[in-house]
């Protein structure tokens, strides 16, 4: 291993190593021999772009981490990736590339067959690019065999769900009010209506004249004037109070609680409430439509214009308490209208234009016609007030066109009938985290029937044929079934337009049945992935592999893919197809905003990789709590790169010294070295096996962030920052020293085990280290197995002692900083005063560790009472607390504290309270009544920690100062060795020119300097060498020369 951490170089080498040696293929062959099965289904990304979003990279990295882990645990893992290739996004992009803007142009100008071919080409090219990006990031999946939702086998398999729904009586054709995109000319399901924009629309109050009462009007409010030509009735709430309000010569009917607000908005100052009455009185009241003379459809429904009870659908939060109702353009209106047998008037075509029955508005785009409608209302004195409103309005998730609601005939699956079954399956599944269950459960409670039909081209054709003679419906469950009943040949490509030519013989009348022109909802495609991706023999494969062990995606997929899988699973198999669901967060920018190119805050993964390398990105992603949103941060990536460098250096240290001493791990057993273990070795083994146990437990819940954080923390905090600082000098012992062998054995053991775990997170770095460091290795670290937990090595008592030691060290470093004494400068002694006798007994066993890390020749451990010899704690009154507690006695209490400061302080520190008497009253002080001020004996510095106090002398002896200077010089020499790229086993020739008054000091410590720097000789005075540098040490200049010697340690 090289000492330089250079991921940009070695990651490319590792990638080439994997490819040249077919590592994934070999791993798969090994993996398939395992008896334990792990079925994973990839939530297929949509290939609308050739470059993955960094959020998608996070998603794939989590998946890769889990799949790598399950392989290491001995599972045969199904890791087929997939791509969700159908649907509007690709159609819209293809339209742009072809320079067209409508469905008509697809049919008339391009041709459906050519359009489908172009869509497929787009999906394939982008999928290839995405695959290359994922492979480049070390995602080990079966990239040679991905599933595509456009594949014939996949489409054929998916038809089984439609067939099953038909057989269960769940498939039907019906009219519902649905969102419609006028540009794409297709319907959208409720869950597809997820994008909103702030749009400015009219906000108008309209008067409907009451029949038989020339001056009385029902007042309604609407922000969609274009729906008024389709008005059928007015809804009220029969339990609300309504008012007749005189305005000029007219009487306006308005909900009583909305009168004041409406008059203010309409700027009507002169009005009078004539009477107030229950809404029930208005029921059945008939009215005249103000546009009846110019909208021909209105003449056909004149006798239906009346007031109906809408119940809770009518509120008093806005409007007038009277609701304009058009069953052809509102889902609530539709349901209420159906209850009262009202007609459905829908005057809008697929393009969003008014039909001929709209009279003067025919042929006009509905939203554009609103101003004309308002003008016509005004001309007919039916407009009470008009203004503008900015509100959040749904738009098409792909083309961003404002959606409209239309009552249209579509194909549905009656999912609402399965609600209880769906809820039962949600309870059975394991949701990580728990709130995922709540969110999807709330959605299912409100589930509506699934509109599965779409009026587009690039999608899975619905396998529904209708007989032209008797209207018999034939639903096909797969291409084999279709081949048996078709009159003509089934095409090789099951897409439109080819599938549209297939004619089926009607089994009822012998007539010819033709396929409906619709394609499936794109969510249908990904929702069948759990079985449709398994190939032609999916039933057999599912019986062997199912159910799916895990699915994981972003939290938006609770209402998307997770629900879609659940729905199709229950329709087809009566159960959820998955056992566990893991939810991850969104990738946001540093301000917490979603990252988009259009927002200017988007960072491509390649930008991160080119700067830091792949594993820095992977580690940073995986250390974020999986189900929480992550904020992208260059600073965090810098820190992650630093942590990787520390991990690298730990392995470099181990590799360097073990190679130097030709240490072979396999030569020794635990029994060989156990008698030579020191407490720090026992502690490290305990920490390692505890970490291993915690990681394995966390991964039962797929908590990859805990895996990433626990393993890296173990190497950085426990090994690098603690263990190696304690044991580093043991590596300088003789090669066959049993103390050294014990240290090597323990270090190698925990480093190899940790590396195997790390390979799931940072596979490039782990593979590089594995190939260079691990002895008697396999061809790849991915072929290893997770080590077994050995409970007998977990020692809580020792771990607790070392945790206290860590606190002592931190406090000691704090005390050094207060005293201005650098860590390299040795101390004669450090006092540690501990509150607990148990802690004192534990720490007395590891004073060598403290001595090494605090750089002190002696560590003196005492109980907390010993600290009193060096310090005094005084109490001063806390007047803010004394006044409210002691009231009239507060002045005397404060005086008492001042006069008895030491005693009060001692009692409160030792007992938590101090009792005393003032004016014959027994009183008690506690910590809230005083401020404690600590005074340490002159010449000493202390630092408190949770278990006690560390104390050291502020002034150093001459001997200590001398040793400090020598250690500073040694550090400079070691740095120069590094600049010369010398190995630790190579000797140097050393020369030093020191200030005149320090020459004797150098001579005194000559042998120590030579030993510490591996100097074959040391000359004092004239300086020469391959590298010569001036150094400032304690404000004096030393010139040092270093050359490589001709001999090295054997």
From Swiss-Prot:
* GO molecular function annotations of the record: aminoacyl-tRNA deacylase activity; ATP binding; isoleucine-tRNA ligase activity; tRNA binding; zinc ion binding
Where found in the cell? Cytoplasm
Q: Which GO terms describe its cellular component?
A: cytoplasm
UniProt cross-references to InterPro entries, sorted A to Z: aa-tRNA-synth_I_CS, aa-tRNA-synth_Ia, Anticodon_Ile_ABEc, Ile-tRNA-ligase, Ile-tRNA-ligase_type2, M/V/L/I-tRNA-synth_anticd-bd, Rossmann-like_a/b/a_fold, tRNAsynth_Ia_anticodon-bd
Which SUPFAM superfamilies does its entry note?
A: Anticodon-binding domain of a subclass of class I aminoacyl-tRNA synthetases, Nucleotidylyl transferase, ValRS/IleRS/LeuRS editing domain
Entries under Pfam families matching the protein = Anticodon_1, DUF5915, tRNA-synt_1
Keywords of the record: Aminoacyl-tRNA synthetase, ATP-binding, Cytoplasm, Ligase, Metal-binding, Nucleotide-binding, Protein biosynthesis, Zinc
Q: Which cofactor does it need?
A: Zn(2+)
Q: Which Gene3D superfamilies match?
A: HUPs, Isoleucyl-tRNA Synthetase, Domain 1
The keyword Metal-binding appears for this protein: yes
Q: What class of enzyme is it?
A: ligase
Q: Which GO terms describe its biological process?
A: isoleucyl-tRNA aminoacylation
Show the catalytic activity. Answer: tRNA(Ile) + L-isoleucine + ATP = L-isoleucyl-tRNA(Ile) + AMP + diphosphate
- E.C. numbers: 6.1.1.5
**Binding of ATP, residues:** 597
Instruction: Find motif ('HIGH' region) and give its ranges.
Output: 45-56
The residue numbers the entry assigns to motif 'KMSKS' region are 594-598
Function description: Catalyzes the attachment of isoleucine to tRNA(Ile). As IleRS can inadvertently accommodate and process structurally similar amino acids such as valine, to avoid such errors it has two additional distinct tRNA(Ile)-dependent editing activities. One activity is designated as 'pretransfer' editing and involves the hydrolysis of activated Val-AMP. The other activity is designated 'posttransfer' editing and involves deacylation of mischarged Val-tRNA(Ile).
Question: Domain annotation text?
Answer: IleRS has two distinct active sites: one for aminoacylation and one for editing. The misactivated valine is translocated from the active site to the editing site, which sterically excludes the correctly activated isoleucine. The single editing site contains two valyl binding pockets, one specific for each substrate (Val-AMP or Val-tRNA(Ile)).
Subunit: Monomer.
Q: Which family does it belong to?
A: Belongs to the class-I aminoacyl-tRNA synthetase family. IleS type 2 subfamily.
Q: Which NCBIfam families match?
A: ileS
The name this protein goes by in its record = Isoleucine--tRNA ligase
Q: Which organism is it from?
A: Sulfolobus acidocaldarius (strain ATCC 33909 / DSM 639 / JCM 8929 / NBRC 15157 / NCIMB 11770)
UniProt gene name:
ileS
